[in-house]
Every structure is written in C-alpha cells, then in structure tokens.
Amino acid sequence: MAFCSPAMMNYNIASNFGDSESASVRQTSSPSLLWSAPGHLSPLTLHCQLSLLYAEQPKSPWCEARPLEPVLPVSRETLKRKTNGSDCTSPIASNPGSKRDAHFCAVCSDYASGYHYGVWSCEGCKAFFKRSIQGHNDYICPATNQCTIDKNRRKSCQACRLRKCYEVGMMKCGSRRERCGYRILRRHRNSEDCMGKTKKYNEAATRVKEILLSTVSPEQFVLTLLEAEPPNVLVSRPSKPFTEASMMMSLTKLADKELVHMIGWAKKIPGFIDLSLYDQVRLLESCWLEVLMIGLMWRSIDHPGKLIFAPDLVLDRDEGKCVEGILEIFDMLLAMTSRFRELKLQHKEYLCVKAMILLNSSMFPLSAEEPESNRKLHHLLNVVTDALVWVIAKSGIPSQQQTTRLANLLMLLSHVRHASNKGMEHLLSMKCKNVVPVYDLLLEMLNAHTLRGQRKSPVTHPDFEQVSHFQV
C-alpha cells in the first residue's frame, strides 16, 4: 500500500524493478498526499501541481497505483509553458534545487518573476511600474535623486524607483511583448534600443518641464514659493546665566534642524530638481547660512532690537556678549533687519529674495559635464527676477519707485553675504576650539566650505539620502 506515490512526487520508477528501460510514470489518487506533504518540495511547486491533482477521476481503488491519465491531453511544450508561465513564472520555483537559470529584477535585484514591460523584473516592481504609467506618477524625491534602490529599500523613494525603471528600459509597450514574444525577447533583447528610447523619453520630459516652467505666471510662481515655506523650528532656550557653550549649543542645534527643512524647501522651488545633482548640492553648500540669516531677519522684522532665532529662542544684543566674537555678527543682523523694516519688506518680496539667494549663489564653476543645467539655472533666475518685479509692481507704487525699490532690495543681498561669511568664520573658530560639537548636516556644510577650493565635486552627506529626514 503506497500512500504517497513516487509519481506524484516527481519521481520516475520502473514498472519492473529489474528493468530500467521500461520506466513509466505512476500516479496515485490517494488524498493522503494532502495529509503528509513532502518536506523537500516548496509550497509554490505543490501549488503548480494542484490542477493535475483535482483533474483526476477517483475511480481506482484507495491505494492502487495506476498510470497518469490526465483529463485533457497536455503536450510537453504546453506543460513547459504552464510551469514557466503566469502560474509559476519564477525560475527558482520551477526547480528549487538549481539557480542556474535564475533571473534577477533589473530594478531592485530581487528574483525576477518574469519578463515584464521589456525587462526582467519582480512582481513588486512590475506592479509599481504599472501603477505609475496608469495613474499617479508625479513623485518627488525627498533627497538628491540618487537613492539606493534594492530589494530592501525599493519602497523608500518612489521617484528614484520610477527613474530606475526607465533607466533599465521598462516601457509601456513591454506589457504586450511579455505575452506574445516571451522567448524571442528573452534571447534577443536589444539593450541599446531600450536605452535609446529611455534617453528620448528623458529629453522629451525635460522639454515639457521647461515649457511648463516658462508658462508659469509670476503669481503662480510666488504661490508655489509660499507653499514651499518650511515650518518654524523649536529649540530649547538655554538656562540663565548664559554661557558660551550653552548658547552655541542651542544655535548649532537650531541650524542643523533648519538645514533639513531647507533641503526640502529648495526641492519644492519649481525647476530646482531639474538641475544636475552636482549643481543642486553646490548651490545649497554655497548659500545655506545666507538663507538661514535672511529667515532670521524676516522673523525679527517686527521686533526691534530682538533676534527671533526660534519662537522659543529670542535674544537681544546684550545676551550675545557671553560668546566671544558673536557680538559683531549680532550687530550686523540687527542693522540689516532694521533696513528691511525701513523698506517695509513684504512677505512675497521676502520669498522671492530668499529664492534668489539660493539660485544666485553660484560663485563656482558649474558642472562642465552638463551644460544644460547651467542654462536651466539662468532661466530659473530670470523667472525668480520676473516674480520679484511682479510683486513690486502689484504694490501700486509709481514705476520709478518700483525700480528704486528693486535696486534697494538687491543691494542688501551683498550685506547678507558679508554677514554669512563672518558667521561661517566664527562657527569654524568655535568648532576648532572645541567650544561646541558639530554633527550631521551642519558638519557636512562646514566641511564643504573649508574644502571648497580643494575638491572638484561636491560631497553628499548620508543624510541627503535618508527619506525619513525630509518631508517633501
């Protein structure tokens, strides 16, 4: 009595134990196969054989072994397609003991389930690409558009995952090819043709973005800047009496928190993420302290004699005396804030000026490998300038005064740069004297300032790729 026929377990036995030439396949209809599943077969393999199990007509005795008699005649090629097709597509599932024929997902390097949309891909990446091309696909990378996409981190950034799908050659037309030309595509995939189509797609997408940016009205651009504004950051006020270490610790913690929000703010400026990664990083490295300072001035504009570093950190001039060398910087910040107050700086003007500081900080050679990025940057600067001119014109003052006001606002930017340089020197001095420890993004920005003249390419801090740090 055989409760588990070898035929059901994919073993071939001879009809006569002494005659190996007359081997035949035997199969049992016993349901005991469901009671005691062989341990060496995967659940996916058993699932593939389920249809054959239910197709039998249980007319034989309980334990009698009889030749395999399928209800429908199935050829070898049909079985091969069924085993390797939609029901059990994975090469690993069809033969658990061998990885020789295994294919890997071109996007995340997981085991591929089949040839989808023109490339080998897993079920997860296939479904993600299908959702992206059929519906929502306006993803934004919260880091620097170079997130690592692998089996464990493929869900961390949708924008970089979709970009990699296009880079490896996934395309809409691939959905039909995988059904009708599977074997031909498997043997004769033309990678150069796929890359060429991807390049054409990227070029077309770039042209569309440029057209959309050029058609954005100044009002729409300013509204986008308004929506991109980062939230207020809270930091604990040091307890009195203030010391040099406690004061600098509070200021550096605040700066590090604001830097994280600044990266998200920059990426929301229309057209910024279309610049090369090199230019994006260099712009942020060059102006981060200027952006922080003009934000401080805007928060302090209605509080004469006070510097509103944060809602819970308000300092006056005398409280800066405890830190060596910072009093001069406090005086510069208070003087510029007073000048903005005299000009009655409006919120929309402040938004445009802050964006202009970021985009006009290119006091370095831009990426020679990507001249298009340089052209995009100049175009983006023109868009910001037009927005500032529009905001001033909307104030209703005479045209001659509009020109004078624009000049007055732009002239203050050089003073902001000067205060930023002073602040950078002071912060580096405090760091070298070990007055206060510096970590994370703030340390990266300081190192970039120190090594700017010695390196050829920007260095990105690991935090730039941590999606959890950037709320875009």
UniProtKB/Swiss-Prot annotation:
A zinc finger (NR C4-type) spans 105-125, 141-165. It is found in: Nucleus. One of its GO terms (cellular component) is nucleus. GO terms for molecular function: nuclear estrogen receptor activity; sequence-specific DNA binding; steroid binding; zinc ion binding. Keywords: DNA-binding, Lipid-binding, Metal-binding, Nucleus, Receptor, Steroid-binding, Transcription, Transcription regulation, Zinc, Zinc-finger. SMART domains: HOLI (SM00430), ZnF_C4 (SM00399). Residues 217-449 form the NR LBD domain. InterPro entries: ER-beta-like_N, ER-beta/gamma, Est_rcpt/est-rel_rcp, NHR-like_dom_sf, Nucl_hrmn_rcpt_lig-bd, Nuclear_hormone_rcpt_NR3, Nuclear_hrmn_rcpt, Znf_hrmn_rcpt. Residues 1-104 are annotated as: Modulating. Pfam families: ERbeta_N, Hormone_recep, zf-C4. Residues 105-170 bind DNA. One of its GO terms (biological process) is cellular response to estradiol stimulus. CDD domains: NR_DBD_ER (cd07171), NR_LBD_ER (cd06949). Belongs to the nuclear hormone receptor family. NR3 subfamily. Composed of three domains: a modulating N-terminal domain, a DNA-binding domain and a C-terminal ligand-binding domain. Binds DNA as a homodimer. Can form a heterodimer with ER-alpha. Binds estrogens with an affinity similar to that of ER-alpha, and activates expression of reporter genes containing estrogen response elements (ERE) in an estrogen-dependent manner. This is Estrogen receptor beta.
